């Protein structure tokens, strides 16, 4: 064992903090849920309409078995990335602190890596080049949801139908950018539909009923650039997708057809600590992952909600 390996101590308590930590504002996992893989590289299925094909399964007496065509299933090469951040704690800070600095360090480093993951998912999902022509729509000046007479319900229905005609299933997930959600809450068409509800205002739960999509998440996360300018990670867009729901306590696998997955190397995230120069404790969070959009036919991007 090398000297550095001896100095670094994997802390199971801090690692469990990192594993259990989630920020409610990060919703990328709704579109590309995390699944564990054994290695940092390899091949996994890429899902097209063939993955959602309805096969003839009835078999007559003494007839041949119905055979699937394995060539229907494509694959892509995957390579995962290591993400790590370390947080320094001076021994004097540790002595004077009124709260546990190690836990604060884990939370800060873990949230920063999760923010990076959220941005990676959002960039993939909101990139028009990720979709075929029939699976995306850029709203015109008269179609944008801030325009008088615009029809959000009709636009969403068209997107749902586009997915259904490609994969035979309706989308069960919708991600709405924060600024798009603000527009939807004030849209006359939606207010008219809920005017007799007890709440009287458009909420996510009411949108689930109006749009008939069981899982809706609003992307509230923001990030700051090098000049401390803040920007929404999720823009004025809506993403519809089919993402299989997790069944009970079963772990997800990358082999079930889905819009996308975030592939993570098994055993991550990990938190370790080491001492530098006798006066600094470095608390380091490491995660190995990469999001992949594997079934573009199972997604639909609506851009330009606010024009």
UniProtKB/Swiss-Prot annotation:
Main location, first listed in the record = virion
Q: Is Membrane among the key words of this record?
A: no
Cellular localization per UniProt = Virion; Host cytoplasm
List UniProt keywords, sorted A-Z: Capsid protein, Host cytoplasm, Late protein, Virion
Any single Gene Ontology cellular-component annotation: viral capsid
Domain of life of the native organism: Viruses
Family to which this protein belongs:
Belongs to the lambda phage major capsid protein family.
User: What function does the entry list?
Assistant: Assembles to form an icosahedral capsid.
UniProt name for this protein: Major capsid protein
Lineage, please? Viruses, Duplodnaviria, Heunggongvirae, Uroviricota, Caudoviricetes
């Amino acid at each position: 064992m090398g000297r550095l390996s001896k100095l670094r101590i994997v802390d199971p308590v801090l690692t469990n903090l990192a594993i259990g930590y989630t920020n409610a504002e990060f919703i990328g996992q709704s579109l590309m849920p995390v699944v564990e893989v054994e290695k940092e590289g390899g091949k996994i299925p890429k899902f097209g309409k063939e993955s959602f094909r309805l096969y003839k399964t009835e078999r007559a007496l003494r007839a041949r078995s119905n055979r699937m065509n394995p060539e229907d299933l494509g694959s892509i090469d995957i390579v995962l990335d290591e993400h790590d951040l370390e947080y320094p704690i001076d021994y004097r800070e540790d002595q004077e602190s009124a709260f546990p600095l190690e836990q604060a360090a884990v939370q800060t480093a873990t949230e920063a890596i999760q923010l990076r993951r959220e941005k990676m998912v959002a960039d993939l999902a909101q990139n028009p080049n990720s979709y075929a022509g029939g699976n995306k729509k850029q709203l015109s000046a008269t179609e944008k949801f801030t325009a008088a007479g615009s029809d959000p319900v009709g636009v969403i229905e068209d997107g749902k139908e586009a997915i259904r005609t490609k994969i035979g299933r309706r989308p069960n997930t919708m991600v709405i950018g924060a600024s798009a959600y603000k527009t939807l809450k004030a849209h006359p068409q939606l207010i008219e539909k809920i005017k007799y509800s007890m709440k009287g205002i458009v909420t996510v739960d009411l949108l689930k009923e109006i749009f008939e999509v069981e899982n809706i998440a609003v992307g509230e996360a923001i990030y700051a650039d090098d000049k401390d300018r803040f920007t929404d990670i999720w823009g004025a867009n809506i993403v519809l997708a089919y993402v299989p729901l997790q069944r009970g306590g079963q772990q997800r696998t990358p082999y079930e057809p889905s819009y996308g997955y975030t592939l993570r190397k098994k055993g991550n995230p990990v938190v370790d600590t080491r001492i530098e120069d006798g006066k600094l404790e470095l608390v380091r969070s490491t995660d190995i992952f990469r999001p992949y959009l594997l079934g573009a036919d199972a997604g639909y991007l609506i851009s330009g909600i606010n024009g």
